[in-house]
Amino acid sequence: MNTQELCKIFVAREYPLVVVPFIYFVLFLHQKYHTTLNYVWYPTCSKRIWVREKGRKCSFFFFSKVPRSDGFANNRCQRK
């Protein structure tokens, strides 16, 4: 068994054990950060995807922070 095969086995077995807790940690920080600042990440207006209300276009590739009160609840897209 050469080094490359050993490496593949290690990655297959150990990688999920490292990545999964890391993802949870990132999500936890993300949640904490947003609840503290009372902000949500909301799609920035651009020319890519239409948002039904008010006919504004939103891109889901570029995000901007808008206050929670003005965020997903009324489904609006805001310019930066």
UniProtKB/Swiss-Prot annotation:
UniProt keyword annotations, A-Z: Membrane, Transmembrane, Transmembrane helix
Domain of life: Eukaryota
Cellular component, GO, one term: membrane
Transmembrane segments: 10-29
Membrane topology term: Single-pass membrane protein
Annotated compartments: Membrane
Chief location: membrane
Protein name: Uncharacterized membrane protein YOR034C-A
Organism: Saccharomyces cerevisiae (strain ATCC 204508 / S288c) (Baker's yeast)
Upper lineage: Eukaryota, Fungi, Dikarya, Ascomycota, Saccharomycotina
